[in-house]
Structure formats: C-alpha cells, structure tokens
Amino acid sequence: MSLSNKLSIRDLDLKNKRVLIRVDFNVPMKDGAITNNNRIVQALPTVKYALDNGASAVILMSHLGRPNGEAVAKYSLKPVAAEVEKLLGKPVEFLNDCVGPDVEKACQSATGGKVILLENLRFHIEEEGSAKVRWSKVKADAEAVKKFRASLTALADIYVNDAFGTAHRAHSSMVGVDLSQRAAGFLMQKELEYFAKALENPARPFLAILGGAKVSDKIQLIENMLDKVNALIVCGGMAFTFKKTLDNVKQIGKSLFDEAGSKLVRNLVKKAAEKNVKLVFPVDFVTADKFAPDANTGYATDADGIPDEWEGLDCGKKSSELFREEILKSKTIVWNGPSGVFEFDAFANGTKSVLNAVIEATKEGATTIIGGGDTATAALKWGAEGKVSHISTGGGASLELLEGKELPGVTALSSKN
C-alpha cells in the first residue's frame, strides 16, 4: 500500500458532479449542544474546495458516538448540520436518514452547489457490520450490507474520504462506496503525505520516540520501527519493563511492570543491535507515593532505584537532556506515546520537555510527526499546533500505520495511475 500514490481531491474534475464526502463529525456533545467544533472546522477546507470547484452538490456523511446499529436520538447529527451551516455561511439540508429511496432522490436531484448532511451512519448495523447485543456480537446480514453500500454509492458521482481517524476500520462508508473515483480529502491527504515521508522515504537520522504503558501493547510498533529507524527512545511506563528485565535499574518499586512484555524485551534489544539501532532509555525518574495528582513526589536514579512503596510517573531532568540531544541530531522524528503521566501537573515536565525539543528540531528543519491519541492531546494542550510538521488526527489509525499495517480506508482509495 503506497501512501504517496493515492488520488487526491485536487486530481479530480468536480464541475457539475455530486461529491460524497466521508467526514469525521464525531464531536463531543452535551445536552444536544456541541462542546468542541474542531473536527467540523478541520473538514471545511475540503468541503469549500468542492464547492469552489463547481460541484453541483456536496453530500456529507459521518458517524457520531456508538449508537450500536440503531437510531438513538442523542447521537443524531442534526445539531451538527446547524453548526456546519453557521461555519460555511450557507444553508445545509439535513436528511433524517443516510440511505434509502428518499435519501437517494434528495441527493440525486440536488443542484446549484447544495450542501446536504446525512443522518448518523451508525444508526444502521450495516455501517460497522456488527452490533453488540448483551455480551455477544451480532453480525449484519451480508445481503443487507450490500444493499446499504449500494444506496450510499447511488448518492453521488465522486467519493472523497477525509476521515483518517476511522481509516483503520473496514466500515461500509470507508470501503463500500463503489464509485470509479475515490479520492483523499485535504485532511486525509496531509496524514498520508507525512506518514509517507516517515515510513517510505525518511530523511536520516530517523528517530522514533515511543512511550505508553505496556510493551506487549506496543510490540508490533516497536518491531516495525526497529526495521526503519536509526535510534529509538523508549519512555513512559513501558521503560520500566525494559529496565527491570535488562537489570539496568536496581529496583522499580510499584512502577508499571508488564510481565507478558518482559518476555519480549531481550529479543527486541537483540534485534536493535542487529539492525544497528541505538536504544535510549530514561536514567532518572520523578516518583510518587500514589497514582494521583496530589501525590507526594520524589526523585530516583537507576543507581538508587525506586523505593518499594513508590512508583515512577515521569522521567527526570537527566533523561530529558539525553532525549533532547538525540532529538536534535535527527532529521525525521515520529513520536507516539507520552514520557510520563502528563495529565497530572507534577509529572508533566518530561513530556513537555520532549515536546519542546521536537519543536526545536522542527525549527532546524527536521520533519516531525506526532501520532494521535494521548501524544496529540499533550501537544495540543501545550500549543504545539503549527510548531511541529504534523499532529495526526487519528489515534488508532496512526498507530496501525506505524505498526506496518494496511488501513482499509486508505487501501480503498483510487491510485493516481
């Protein structure tokens, strides 16, 4: 799966065409009101581009929440239609369903640059292909899925996918729209462009910074990165599993230890040596007497070890300096996983200092990519937008790409040639 060879909305002639755009309008809501419209704002450049380039109609489809394959009023996209209308500055017609004869008729007769928002795709079990009933999963009927996908296909002439955050899911709206031109929108294109820079043709030295809790959860990620990078910083909770297994530290107290992951550590270290990948671990820690924002804090080094009733919740100043040196040597940097429990102020400095070093490296010309999820949350919290090359919008999707997996929603896009 080449990331850099996918058809983009810029490659298409949109004049007098109906354009079906899969957006990600999965926005937080409270009492029927949108509490953060960022995802809607991010989708607008693709919508505006289609309108500015003569599309006869733009039809938007999205999911919201987890309604489990049935219509649930609190997950209706109706409030989103009003927000899109406000931000676009033009009327948006909201349809009460996303498939079926009435929806097909409304979309097929739309002209003059009309904008339509369909109701939540996940109100139908056929979107995700299954639903949870009590403790078991019920699969959607294959014939019904085919019909659902055919109805989505009937809505437009061209399909555009701008929902990178759902690209790792083989849902009907991601892989089942059978139009001859299936292109990436601007958000999707930017994600593919930057991940291609890292995974297909990185400027070197190439550094990965991997944090998070469990080695066993990140095994595929570490394995895949060891095949690609020149150096790897291991931080966050999973560093303790490495350090204890390799006897690099006297004792780790109550710090996270991943028993299953510990069995994989020696092979990973061996692979790093074979591939000539430099491994960098923290050497000192900010410790806590409990896992809480109001915990008493302490300090420990590898040589001292962490006392029995204490746990490491962040890396210390010496580690931050080590990490900074490695970051500033690098020309391509991918960061996935914070280096401490940044949600608690007392244990946020390690993650903050990694972020500052990544920003510094960006200024010096490095390509810097921050994976989605917690790392993106931390980066946005401290105002890094525009100061690093790319902050991914997809937690699970970016992780799977970095693990070397194919994303169904990307595979389904047309290639340029």
From Swiss-Prot:
ADP binds at G212, G236, F342. Mg(2+) binds at A213, D217, D374. Keywords: ATP-binding, Cytoplasm, Glycolysis, Kinase, Magnesium, Metal-binding, Mitochondrion, Nucleotide-binding, Transferase. GO terms for biological process: gluconeogenesis; glycolytic process. Its cofactor is Mg(2+). Its EC number is 2.7.2.3. InterPro entries: Phosphoglycerate_kinase (IPR001576), Phosphoglycerate_kinase_CS (IPR015911), Phosphoglycerate_kinase_N (IPR015824), Phosphoglycerate_kinase_sf (IPR036043). GO terms for molecular function: ADP binding; ATP binding; metal ion binding; phosphoglycerate kinase activity. CDP binds at G212, D217, G236, G337, F342. It catalyses: (2R)-3-phosphoglycerate + ATP = (2R)-3-phospho-glyceroyl phosphate + ADP. ATP binds at A213, K218, G237, G312, E343, D374, T375. GO terms for cellular component: cytosol; mitochondrion. Catalyzes one of the two ATP producing reactions in the glycolytic pathway via the reversible conversion of 1,3-diphosphoglycerate to 3-phosphoglycerate. Both L- and D- forms of purine and pyrimidine nucleotides can be used as substrates, but the activity is much lower on pyrimidines. Negatively regulates the biosynthesis of acetyl-CoA from pyruvate in the mitochondrion. Belongs to the phosphoglycerate kinase family. Monomer. This is Phosphoglycerate kinase 2. The lineage of its organism: Eukaryota, Fungi, Fungi incertae sedis, Mucoromycota, Mucoromycotina.
